[in-house]
Amino acid sequence: MKCGQWSRLREPFLLGPPKGDGPVVVRASFQVRDINDLDDEAETFEFGGVLKLTWHDERQAFDPAEAGVAEKIYQGAYQFNELSPAWYPQVVLVNESGLFEKHGVILRVQPDGTLTLVETVNAAAFAFF
């Protein structure tokens, strides 16, 4: 095993949730931007809005002077999915009725390890009118 491979094995596993005394506390908010296509017969509606999740992961903390930035920002699907080395909460719409799209993703990482994920959501959901 090469030295570089060994050092990677000793680094903390960043794609799993942070280890701690309990569950990861995630603050969530959702701002509804529009409601479309109310269907009384199917008992569904479509909506769009902005989802914001904030949590703390000390493994993501960094020194701004060393990193050369006051905050790390990953924006767009490529940077978020391929470049950001972070675990993030998975969101599920339990009353989804076929449409659940997320776009415009941005992940902000503060020096203390506070992460904020913001993305737009377009979805259809069952609503029992």
Would you name each region that the model predicts?
Residues 1-129:
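Soluble non-transmembrane domains of integral membrane proteins
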